[in-house]
């Protein structure tokens, strides 16, 4: 028999759940989590509360926490299909398709007449089949050839069916062939074969002259050098939703590859006395917000350098425009822009969150492989003037890591699931001291004491990282020793957050934080190119 206090707790828990639901509807997912937590504290035997909190964690990309909460919902009520549903969705978002499939099969068993469950199960089955196929045909890493080394952008231009080879050149070739025939003497059939071969061969060679089609009206690179005028024209074309010729896209990516290949895994940046550098966080395919950053803070140049701290692509549907713009500035002047790898510069993320599909749609399949290769060359971290450590994710599961250890990382690979490289890309700060499990399910959470020891051990003053949405575009934590900066305002067109960037001026290197709001963009929704099964859960 329930007591009066127990009835009161259940009633108050329902009130908190209702408030949490309203916060969720308003895209205030952190507030929703806090309110669901209060409901759980009053009544932990309600599976709905756990499943709802799991959904809110999923919205914040905290998939590890979502899986924990959904598992708790299942523990409370093994017949509650939403628990399996929420856990399966979190597994999908992490790319753990086989685990997701098991959960959706259970959803189908519990709700056999639910058309939505049937549809999602089919999509998950397709994803698992595709994964098995890719595993079956994959080439071992040791046997893979560089995609970049198979591409010569100079030969990319006119196609044979649209050759612009001048007619007089073809006629000249025919005349020469006739003279040979007259001198040597051939039968009629042989003469025809010679003439046809000459004409077709002339046009075929013309098609590989490397000249860009005359009807192409977009930005052009003259020769080998990427200039500021070209980059400005290209950005204006992108702004107007025009495309860049594949020849120039190849040229930009291949030249960037050569620059990145020569860099160490940890790059030291020197900012002269009286000069500055701007650090930006995640931009996630939000090209029009990137243009706004340049409008507010100036274009990248040797006098106005930027460091973009990873997660250039995915989520937003203008990732191709973002990456070509950043790479073009790197080609134009390598010291005008520094680029760090984020957890989304990886095959596993790009398959799920839209970049791979967008590249396939806007460029070609070969570019998918090329970007995957070049992303492996991006540095993992930067140190500015020996004082500011900048990394996408965060710190490590062990103490005593030195900058020399980071420099020694062999980064030319897909991110592993554990170790220093994984933690640099995936870890997050936590308010409590020490270390804890990652709310994402990858990496770890680290406290202010961990930050303090790392900075002291390496004679550093500040840790700047990105990787997390913040309402104001930034957050200062760990007694002022850690700053999170996030530069994608109104993330995914729904979070309502501001964006931010940080300017550091030498010699004092004090952070000057600038915030900004989202700007309009064409009516292309985030995740427009993402896998269909993932879009169903967003």
UniProtKB/Swiss-Prot annotation:
TPR repeats lie at residues 13-46, 48-80, 81-114. Its cofactor is Mn(2+). Belongs to the PPP phosphatase family. PP-5 (PP-T) subfamily. Signal peptide: none annotated. GO terms for biological process: chloroplast-nucleus signaling pathway; negative regulation of chlorophyll biosynthetic process; nucleocytoplasmic transport; red or far-red light signaling pathway. Binds 2 manganese ions per subunit. Its EC number is 3.1.3.16. The lineage of its organism: Eukaryota, Viridiplantae, Streptophyta, Embryophyta, Tracheophyta. Isoform 2 dephosphorylates phosphorylated phytochromes, with a preference toward Pfr forms, and enhances phytochrome-mediated photoresponses, probably by enhancing their stability and their binding affinity for light signal transducers such as NDPK2. Can use para-nitrophenylphosphate (pNPP) as substrate. GO terms for molecular function: metal ion binding; phosphoprotein phosphatase activity; protein serine/threonine phosphatase activity; tetrapyrrole binding. Activated by arachidonic acid (AA). It catalyses: O-phospho-L-seryl-[protein] + H2O = L-seryl-[protein] + phosphate; O-phospho-L-threonyl-[protein] + H2O = L-threonyl-[protein] + phosphate. TPR repeats are required for the binding with phytochromes. GO terms for cellular component: cytoplasm; cytosol; endoplasmic reticulum membrane; nuclear envelope; nuclear membrane; nuclear speck; nucleus; plasmodesma. This is Serine/threonine-protein phosphatase 5. Interacts with PHYA and PHYB, mostly when they are phosphorylated and in Pfr forms. Keywords: Cytoplasm, Endoplasmic reticulum, Hydrolase, Manganese, Membrane, Metal-binding, Nucleus, Protein phosphatase, Repeat, TPR repeat, Transmembrane, Transmembrane helix. Mn(2+) 2 binds at residues 311, 343, 392, 467. The keyword Transmembrane applies. The chain crosses the membrane at residues 163-183, 185-205. It holds the Pfam family PPP5.
């Amino acid at each position: 028999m329930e007591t009066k206090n127990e009835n009161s707790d259940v009633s108050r828990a329902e009130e908190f759940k209702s408030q949490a639901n309203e916060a969720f509807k308003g895209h205030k997912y952190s507030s929703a989590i806090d309110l669901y937590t209060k409901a759980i504290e009053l009544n932990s035997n309600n599976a709905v509360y756990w499943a709802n909190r799991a959904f809110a964690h999923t919205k914040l990309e905290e998939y590890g926490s979502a899986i924990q909460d959904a598992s708790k919902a299942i523990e409370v009520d093994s017949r509650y299909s939403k628990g399996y549903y929420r856990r399966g969705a979190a597994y999908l978002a992490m790319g753990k398709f086989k685990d997701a499939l098991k959960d959706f099969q259970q959803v189908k068993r519990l709700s056999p007449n639910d058309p939505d469950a049937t549809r999602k199960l089919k999509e998950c089955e397709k994803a698992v089949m595709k994964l098995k196929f890719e595993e079956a045909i994959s080439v071992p890493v040791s046997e893979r050839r560089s995609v970049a080394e198979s591409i010569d952008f100079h030969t990319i231009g006119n196609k044979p069916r649209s050759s612009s080879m001048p007619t007089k050149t073809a006629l000249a070739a025919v005349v020469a062939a006739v003279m040979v025939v007259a001198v040597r003497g051939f039968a009629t059939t042989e003469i025809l074969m010679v003439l046809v071969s000459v004409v077709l061969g002339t046009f075929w060679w013309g098609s590989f002259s490397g000249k860009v089609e005359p009807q192409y009206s977009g930005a052009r690179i003259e020769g080998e050098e990427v200039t500021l005028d070209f980059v400005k024209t290209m950005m204006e074309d992108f702004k107007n939703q025009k495309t860049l010729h594949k020849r120039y896209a190849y040229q930009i990516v291949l030249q960037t590859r050569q620059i990145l290949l020569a860099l160490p895994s940890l790059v030291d940046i020197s900012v002269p006395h009286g000069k500055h550098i701007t650090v930006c966080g995640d931009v996630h395919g939000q090209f029009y917000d990137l243009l706004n950053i340049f409008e507010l803070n100036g274009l990248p140049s040797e006098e106005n350098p930027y460091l973009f701290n990873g997660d250039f692509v995915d989520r937003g549907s203008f990732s191709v425009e973002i990456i070509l713009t950043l790479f073009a500035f790197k080609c134009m002047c390598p010291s005008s822009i520094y680029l760090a790898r984020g957890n989304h510069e990886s095959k596993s993320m790009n398959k799920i969150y839209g970049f791979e599909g967008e590249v396939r749609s806007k460029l070609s399949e070969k570019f998918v492989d090329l970007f995957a290769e070049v992303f492996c060359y991006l540095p993992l971290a930067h140190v500015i003037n020996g004082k500011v450590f900048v990394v996408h994710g965060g710190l490590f599961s062990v103490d005593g890591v030195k900058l020399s250890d980071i420099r020694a990382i062999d980064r030319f690979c897909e991110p592993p699931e554990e170790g220093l490289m994984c933690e640099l890309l995936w870890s997050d700060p936590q308010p409590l001291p020490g270390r804890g499990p990652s709310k994402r399910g990858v990496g770890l959470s680290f406290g202010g004491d961990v930050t303090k020891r790392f900075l002291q051990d390496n004679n550093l003053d500040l840790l700047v990282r990105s990787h997390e949405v913040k309402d104001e575009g930034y957050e200062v934590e760990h007694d002022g020793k850690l700053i999170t900066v996030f530069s994608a305002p109104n993330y995914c067109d729904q979070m309502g957050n501001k964006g931010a960037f940080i300017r550091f001026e030498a010699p004092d290197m004090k952070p000057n934080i600038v915030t900004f709001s989202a700007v309009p963009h064409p009516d292309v929704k985030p995740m427009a190119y993402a896998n269909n099964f993932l879009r169903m859960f967003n």
